[in-house]
Regions:
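A broad, low-specificity signal for short, low-complexity segments enriched in glycine/proline
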Residues: 19, 45-49, 105, 124-128, ...
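Short basic/glycine-enriched coil/helix segment immediately N-terminal to the Walker B
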Residues: 50, 54, 136-140, 150-162
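Short N-terminal secondary-structure initiator segments
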Residues: 9-24, 138-139, 211-226, 339
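Pre-P-loop entry segment of helicase/translocase ATPase cores
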Residues: 1-55, 117-134
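A residue-identity detector for tryptophan
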Residues: 31, 46, 50, 113, ...
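Inter-Walker segment of RecA-like/P-loop motor cores
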Residues: 104-152, 351
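Conserved helicase motor core of SF1/SF2 NTP-dependent helicases
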Residues: 59, 64, 70, 76-84, ...
Length: 434
């Protein structure tokens, strides 16, 4: 213990106290795409990609946030890991939507776009056309284009560190192989229950091959290199309610269990009575898939829905034509419905292929087998039915042909597609009538 000397009668001037420079508290600035760490599942996707796994496959149910994941992953890899990232979308609309999402996170992205098409509005993402498209030379960057556009470019000039393939179950294995010229690492994100790639060429020679170039890219990739592939599964849907999840999960995703995390959302009729999440209407059809009775039923149901109110966590409001979609199996059906409801310009009407990846609060679906008297052809494609039954958030009305149960009952016992349709139709017939 230190004591003062006895002869000291007054305090001596205090010696200056040496100052020690204390380290400053570091400021942690958020980096582009950092929200990907907020969920342990999406964080695993980032970890797998950043770790250098040659292929990462992310199977997802409808409405699980695939587009958001792709945008966050690309922004994180470019902004935090300083990588050159390519994003391959399957349609121009998907590419534009991704450009908007990525542009909201980082200013290092560009959308490769043909000068022949009108320039889309993509805030935060520049439009790159012509032959002068390049990655930045001093930091990471992101280039977004359709798969077809990527295959038109020169891999020697646009080589990237990692290629993210959005809606990859819509891409063929042949397309994925061609994209391999751009990057040695690939991330495939998509929905395995939706429509397979549209292939117009002859594919009989690969009929029994699990790695045929016409097959969905992730399925063939797993068949060819399963041991080298990391798989991270998204197991929650934020779009579909519990009733819809219970309908489509066992029928279309038997190996991909998932649950609903959609916030409460429903419609009410003019009397305030809640509408069920799923309802159906049976129609007598005599003139095939183009029967006017089917078109009339769809149009009448849309008019009824436009008199309802939408209830969400944000409040209550009248349902508008911007909130409603009609999905059909055929272009001619969609055209007839669109013409009948032409006074509702914001109503979304299209085929399952056209509406794949889109959503609305309320949807009217024309059953793909309506008007058919056999189960041959593309009408029984499970992927098409899956898309048609999963575009809605609050309500789905399904217009059915009253003869369809008899048609499916007469199908061959080993017809797996017809068996899936029988299961789904039985569940639909147990929903309330409109």
């Amino acid at each position: 213990m230190r004591t003062m000397p006895h002869h000291v009668t007054q305090a001596a001037p205090a010696a200056p106290v040496p100052t020690v420079a204390s380290p400053q508290t570091p400021h942690h600035h958020p980096w582009p795409g950092q929200a990907i760490l907020n969920d342990p599942v999406t964080a695993r996707v980032l970890h797998a990609a950043w770790s250098g796994d040659p292929a990462v496959i992310v199977p997802s149910p409808p409405g699980a946030g695939k587009t958001r994941l792709v945008a966050l992953l690309a922004a994180a890899l470019a902004g935090r890991a300083d990588l050159r990232v390519g994003i391959a979308a399957q349609t121009r609309d998907q590419a534009v939507e991704l450009a908007r999402r990525v542009g909201a996170l980082t200013d290092t992205a560009a959308l490769i776009w043909s000068a022949k098409h009108p320039r889309p509005d993509t805030p935060g993402t520049r439009i790159a056309a012509g032959t002068g498209v390049r990655y930045p030379t001093d930091h990471g960057g992101i280039l977004i284009a359709t798969t077809a556009r990527w295959l038109y470019c020169d891999p020697a000039q646009l080589r990237c560190d990692i290629m993210i393939v959005d809606e990859s179950w819509q891409a063929t294995y042949g397309d994925l192989g061609a994209l391999g010229a751009y990057a040695t690492q690939v991330v495939c994100v998509g929905d395995p229950g939706q429509i397979d790639p549209v292939v117009t060429g002859e594919t009989r020679r690969w009929r029994t091959s699990p790695t045929g170039p016409h097959l969905p890219a992730p399925d063939a990739l797993i068949a060819a290199h399963g041991d080298a592939i990391a798989t991270v599964t998204l197991r929650h849907t934020w779009r579909l309610g519990p009733d819809t999840t219970a309908l489509i999960q066992p029928a279309f995703y038997p190996t991909l269990p998932f649950t609903s995390r959609r916030p409460p959302e429903h419609l009410t009729d003019p009397t305030g009575h809640p509408l069920p999440e799923i309802a159906h209407q049976q129609v007598a059809v005599n003139a095939g898939p183009g029967d006017p009775a089917l078109v009339t039923a769809c149009a009448d149901r849309v008019r009824t829905l436009l008199d309802t109110h939408l209830h969400t966590s944000e409040g209550t409001r009248a349902l508008s034509d911007k909130d409603v979609a009609v999905v059909c199996a055929h272009v001619t059906q969609a055209a007839a419905v669109r013409a009948t409801l032409a006074h509702h310009p914001h109503l979304l009407v299209g085929t399952a292929n056209q509406l794949q990846g889109l959503e609305r609060h309320a949807v009217v679906a024309l059953h793909p087998l309506a008007g058919y008297r056999d189960t041959e052809g593309h009408a029984t494609d499970p992927g098409r039915a899956c898309v048609m039954l999963s575009r809605h958030r609050a309500h789905l009305s399904v217009v059915l042909d009253a003869t369809t149960p008899t048609v499916l009952a007469a199908a061959e016992a080993d017809d797996t597609a017809a068996r899936t349709h029988r299961t789904v139709l039985t569940a639909l017939l147990n929903t309330p009538r409109t």
